Swiss-Prot record:
UniProt organism field: Lacticaseibacillus paracasei (strain ATCC 334 / BCRC 17002 / CCUG 31169 / CIP 107868 / KCTC 3260 / NRRL B-441)
Enzyme class, spelled out: ligase
Cellular component, GO annotation: cytosol
Chief subcellular location: cytoplasm
Gene Ontology MF, one: ATP binding
UniProt short sequence motif 'HIGH' region, positions renumbered to this chain: 40-51
EC number: 6.1.1.4
Record family assignment: Belongs to the class-I aminoacyl-tRNA synthetase family.
Record keyword Cytoplasm present: yes
Protein name: Leucine--tRNA ligase
Keyword Nucleotide-binding attributed: yes
Compartmental location: Cytoplasm
Keywords carried by this UniProt record: Aminoacyl-tRNA synthetase, ATP-binding, Cytoplasm, Ligase, Nucleotide-binding, Protein biosynthesis
Length: 803
């Protein structure tokens, strides 16, 4: 018989809320466990079925850990600043604050309808001044330590959005959100010196329990390179410029130089004959993001400036080109090109007919660049040396001549930390008329966002806050006039430290109490989408390391264990989107099938990190299993089945203990699909048995409760319990009940599988051999033959050799 999910879901959600069931306990005798989801941006669309996948996973672990005797911190909040709310407000004339508040209410209602065990007393919202007071405080500490500074930097400017967007938010020369065109232009921006932490961010990765693919993405993003910086000179003007190379040993093979289109020397050295093509190329490059420019698979483009550089090692003249694959912001903005031994340089040289000169033996440079090691040739004092020795010798030569030195370079660049928008944290800085810049005093934080704002972009590149003269203009006690900083922080700011605030969300004196942080941090389990692999996780690690260095927090790393859930695709195997009409609303699923069915189905679809297509058939199957669980224990009158008894005849011992062991291990490993499979095995066995031991029924209910909490609470109460099973002790298993007295063995005859036998643990090898020879199928292949040899591989296989 089917259960009534509408009634049961609401009943237990009400019970949990009224009893503050999931408030974080702080029993000093218990160990602590911190399970965290990447908190969502509350969009206007509300939850889609992709959100609950990660949320259900952390909820299962949080619920199990409570039952295992842990204090569990499992909070939820809102990453609510950001462009989408502001764009909506601009399009509709509504204030983003109102819109965001409504969205949060929708998200919270939907989350609660799914029965997640969040401690709502710790709810945080990045747009709450009581929260962003501490975001501003962190900015002020960064500024005091020289890690926040202003600079003129080339940025991705979107005229339509009226703001700067990050490199990662530009795709094919357009903004990721909205598809608006982007141009590169220099602007005054606030920067955070994340590069100061490049080495720490790199080395500390080794100690984290993170997917190797994510760690590798961070390593690549930081992009550490060891090599040399070499000074070249423009041939006629003798203007010096530096290049960075990881292969200084190939300097004799350099046949041209490439500068970034933005390099400061380009306009100085371009000849009149080349000026027009150079200007056109520079303009074209300004419309591309750094990511587009450096894509490995893109065709190389470039133009010659008409100028030459002198190779410092042999005096040869090298043509100076510009190409957009060289970035002004990486290294020195200029590279030496050795086409014989670099694939990208080779493709460029072939395309533009530039000389290719081999300096390492091996390969055929008429066909391809040779990038392997080998003996140096055509290289003067390096001839006959291998790569390692030649690099050392060349660096010594450069240092002796004063024209170069060993250098470590990072691809990582400082973080552009300002946005020309209204809906973000105000940057607590005042620019005074005498040129001084000061911070807003700490005791005046938070510097709040003015409520009634004309939030249209100013059009000048400044934030809409620039229009609010009453807010912008300030006078100090000595009559000195100043203007507030009108740029706001990016959406990444609030999410770079929120995991710390959850530990102590109501603290008015500090971002969080040091001892409480010591008790809870780092986060034990952090689950979210792989799309945050680089930025959010890198920024959060940077802020955490900085706060650790200044003694504000006790832990270096924020997230000990990270897991990325896969993407739930539409039933047509494409990404869910409104335009494709394949979005599934969780409200509809909960209404038709119940919250527990949605939770169970999403965990049973496949491995948690796999991308899997949504299936209504699979959803119906999940519901059918829950109905089978219900009817295994509850009769048609809604009463406990008579066969639930305190007597245990031992017939379910093995399957029950196997189930407890497997489910416990699988929950810890986040292998929820296989845990569910094992629970299905138990239910199938239980339904066939005349007597169900009460202990095993209760143990099973506890095991399924983290996945299907509403239905299991209902069965638990009908088993006679007057308290919730939130803190009911997790079941244990008896290893001796899992061990069996028999095991299966395969039988091979002359190397081919011909049958199997069931052997007793006490049987001797001779008895096993006799049983194998007596097998009906084996006898077909041994009849009339001499048995030359029988080999018993214990507990695995019997090999019979017959001639």
């Amino acid at each position: 018989m089917a259960y009534d999910h509408h009634e049961i879901d609401k009943k237990w959600q009400r019970y949990w809320a009224e009893h503050n069931e999931f408030n974080t306990t702080t029993d000093p005798k218990k160990p602590n466990y911190y399970a965290l989801d990447m908190f969502p941006y509350p969009s206007g669309q509300g939850l889609h079925v992709g959100h609950p996948e990660g949320y259900t996973a952390t909820d299962i672990v949080a619920r199990m850990k409570r039952m295992q005797g842990f204090n569990v911190l499992h909070p939820m909040g809102w990453d609510a600043f950001g462009l989408p709310a502001e764009q909506y407000a601009l399009n509709t004339g509504h204030n983003p604050k109102t819109f965001t508040k409504q969205n949060i209410e929708t998200f919270k209602r939907q989350i609660n309808s799914l029965g997640f065990s969040y401690d709502w007393n710790r709810e945080i919202n990045t747009t709450d001044p009581n929260y962003y007071k501490w975001t501003q405080w962190i900015f002020e500490q960064l500024y005091k330590h020289g890690l926040a500074y202003e600079a003129e930097v080339p940025v991705n400017w979107s005229p339509d959005l009226g703001t700067v967007v990050a490199n990662e938010e530009v795709i094919d020369g357009k903004t990721e959100r909205g598809g608006f065109p982007v141009v590169r232009k220099p602007m005054r921006q606030w920067m955070l010196k994340i590069t100061a932490y490049a080495e720490k961010l790199l080395t500390d990765l080794d100690d984290l329990d993170w997917p190797e693919s994510i760690k590798q993405m961070q390593r690549n993003w930081i992009g550490k390179s060891t090599g040399a910086q070499i000074t070249f000179r423009v041939t006629d003007s003798h203007e010096p410029f530096d290049v960075f190379t990881t292969r200084p040993d190939t300097l004799f093979g350099a046949t041209y130089v490439v500068m970034a289109p933005e390099h400061e020397l380009v306009q100085k050295i371009t000849t009149p004959a080349q000026q027009a093509v150079v200007d056109a190329y520079i303009d074209e490059a300004a419309h591309k993001s750094d990511l587009d420019r450096t894509a490995l698979d893109k065709e190389k483009t470039g133009v010659w400036t008409g100028a030459y550089a002198t190779n410092p090692v042999n005096g040869e003249k090298l043509p100076i080109w510009i190409s957009d694959y060289v970035l002004a912001s990486y290294g020195t903005g200029a590279i030496m090109s050795v086409p014989a031994h670099d694939d990208r340089d080779y493709a460029f040289a072939k395309k533009f007919g530039i000389e290719i000169k081999p300096v390492i033996e091996g390969g055929n440079v008429d066909e391809a660049a040779y990038t392997g090691d080998g003996v140096h040739i055509n290289s003067g004092f390096l001839d006959g040396l291998n790569e390692h020795d030649a690099i050392d010798r060349m660096i010594k030569w450069l240092e002796d001549k004063g024209i170069g030195s060993a250098k470590i370079n990072y691809k990582l660049r400082d973080w552009v930390f300002s946005r020309q928008r209204y809906w973000g944290e105000p940057i607590p800085v005042i620019h005074w008329e005498d040129g001084e810049t000061t911070l807003v005093p700490e005791d005046e934080l938070p510097l709040t966002l003015p409520e009634e704002a004309d939030i249209k972009p100013s059009g000048t590149g400044e934030s809409p806050l620039a229009n609010l003269t009453d807010w912008v203009n300030v006078v100090d006690k000595n009559g000195r006039k100043g203007k507030r900083e009108t740029n706001t922080m990016p959406q990444w700011a609030g999410s770079s430290w929120y995991f710390l605030r959850f530990v102590d969300p109501h603290n008015k004196e500090a971002l969080a109490d040091y001892d409480k942080l010591k008790a809870w941090m780092p986060v034990d389990l952090y689950i979210g989408g792989a799309e945050h692999a680089v930025l959010h996780l890198l920024y959060a690690r940077f802020w955490n390391l900085f706060l650790y260095d200044i003694g504000a927090i006790p832990n270096k790393e924020p997230f000990q264990r990270l897991f990325n859930q896969g993407m739930i695709l539409g039933d047509n195997h494409e990404k869910m989107s409104k335009s494709k009409g394949n979005v599934v609303n969780p409200d509809d699923v909960v209404d038709e099938y119940g919250a527990d069915t949605l939770r169970l189905y999403e965990m049973f679809m496949g491995p948690l990190d796999a991308g899997i297509a949504w299936s209504t058939k699979g959803l119906a199957g999940a519901r059918k299993f829950l109905d089978r669980v219900w009817s295994a224990f509850i009769d048609d009158e809604g009463k406990l089945r008579d066969r639930i008894t305190t007597i245990n005849d031992g017939r379910l011992d093995k399957v029950y203990n196997e189930t407890v062991k497997k489910v416990t291990e699988d929950y810890d490993a986040l292998h929820f699909n296989t845990a569910i499979s094992q629970m299905m095995v138990f239910i199938n066995s239980a339904r066939k048995d005349d007597d169900l031991p009460l202990e095993y029924v209760e143990g099973f209910v506890k095991m399924l409760a983290p996945i299907a909490p509403h239905l299991m609470e209902e069965i638990w109460s009908r088993l006679g319990h007057d308290h919730s099973l939130t803190y009911a002790p997790w079941p244990s298993y008896d290893e001796s009940k899992i061990k069996t007295d028999t095991y299966d063995m395969m039988i091979q005859v002359n190397g081919k599988l011909r049958g199997s036998i069931t052997a007793d643990v006490n049987e001797s090898d001779d008895e096993i051999k006799q049983a194998a020879l007596a097998n009906d199928n084996v006898q077909k292949f041994t009849a009339g033959k001499d048995i030359k040899k029988i080999i018993v591989v214990p507990r695995k296989i019997v090999n019979i050799v017959a001639k």
